[in-house]
Amino acid sequence: MVPRLLEYIMNNIKLTTRKTHKEKMLGRMVGISNAMRAAHIDIRKMLFRSVLAEFGGKMRMIACGGAELDSRVFNYLDDLGFNIYQGYGLTETAPILTIRGMFVKSKAGVGRPLRDVRLKIDKPNEMGEGEIVVKAPQVMIGYYHDKKATNEVLRNGWFYTGDLGRIRKDGNLEVVGRKKNVIVASNGKNIYPEELETLINYSDLVRESVVSGMKKGSGIQIVATIVLEDKYKNCSTVDSEIEKLIEEINANLPEYKRINKYVIRQDEFRKTTTMKIKRGSK
């Protein structure tokens, strides 16, 4: 399952509890459950059985991949008893390299490498961020009849993923974005569009968004193109609500990462078969 579907599930649960005036009650139940979990007593399946019953009542786990799942979505659903396993990998790695949830209980990142997977960060910056490179038995031997493309990603037995990430203190890999999507600010620091998009997409107003960098004078202007949820498209106050959202996001960001402008788009972005937005498409 791709992260966007889990976001949809979370938003629908929130909407239902809000409509039925059970939001506060659910919050209290989560508080009780988490206190019990801290004492190694898990009552989630019993406490939230009415929520889980909406998904058949027999769901053991959800495997999530295709992109990193927002930790807030993971935490929300985990609190309600959803067992989510987040994986990371590529088609070229057949397809999994790390996993979080099955043996690793961290609520951030995409987990630790599987057995026999060697993973490192190439040329890390001062934040420890660099390209994720791997060496493992499941890595492809090359692209069919394309030696040039093969040589670009396979070097000295290591596969260069094109993804940027860092290793957290708990040993989990955290993916911060795609190398080709990075926006370089005027101060030379990296801005990862995916990070800003996650913050924007967390709002109930927003269906999806794309953040890009546009030249303005000698600097870069950060622009967010936003697709609203259908029910808000004709809302008279939506512009002021989006402005407020951007202000709240910017308040917690360093100046070079702040969103300078937003554009509301009517049509959804074109997507790949794995529901990833095709950047640059109209």
Predicted ranges, named:
Residues 1-61, 228-245, 249-250:
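Alpha-helical "lid/cap" subdomains adjacent to substrate-binding clefts that gate access
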Residues 1-7, 12-14, 76-79, 101-102, ...:
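Soluble, non-transmembrane catalytic domains of enzymes that act on hydrophobic metabolites at membranes
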